[in-house]
Amino acid sequence: MLLQAILLGLVAMLGNAEYLFGTSLLSRPLVMGALTGVVLGDIPTGVTLGATLELAFMGAFSIGASIPPEMISGTVLGTAFTITTGAGPETALTVGLPVASLVLIAKNVGMVFILPPFVHKADTYAAEGNMAGVARMHFLGGFFGVNLIIGVIVACGYYAGGPAVQALFCLLYTSPSPRDV
């Protein structure tokens, strides 16, 4: 299970690195679901669940200040938990969409607190005319500021298992009643 968790984290990191290879659409749920199926040994189910999640995330692109949920982690974890439990596509949706929303928060935290030092160092390199340094900061900042965060969350989420993820959802999505306040 640890090896599968690590591989799923790497799949999520590959999907998040899509712009490294141009706009390859690696991050789309159809591709992520298929790769998750490869890791878990059930490619047909991975493709089916990826297609289901593709319908849910269709049109999930940033427009203006609107940031869509982080569909890579939602697809990988939703597909992985559905394949390992033998549940239906509705499970992939009910796990994938909340996970995608939560991971978006973690991704934004990485962009606010981890990425800026790399950007400032890149500015220093640019002022010196060191383009290799700028490129290096670009890759390192993207890796540590976003990519690694998503990979670790996916790997730890899968390794912790469904009950731990469900407990987290219950903790976050249970709000007190107005009568309790």
Locate each region found by the language model.
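Hydrophobic transmembrane alpha-helices
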Residues: 1-73
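Short helix-perturbing small/polar motifs within transmembrane alpha-helices
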Residues: 7-8, 12, 16, 61, ...
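Alpha-helical membrane segments and immediately flanking helix-loop junctions
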Residues: 10, 49-56, 63-77, 81, ...
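Membrane-water interface at transmembrane helix exits
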Residues: 15, 19, 41, 53, ...
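Helix-loop-helix junctions within the multi-pass membrane cores of secondary transporters/permeases
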Residues: 94-172
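Single conserved hydrophobic/aromatic residue that forms the stacking wall/gate
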Residues: 173-181
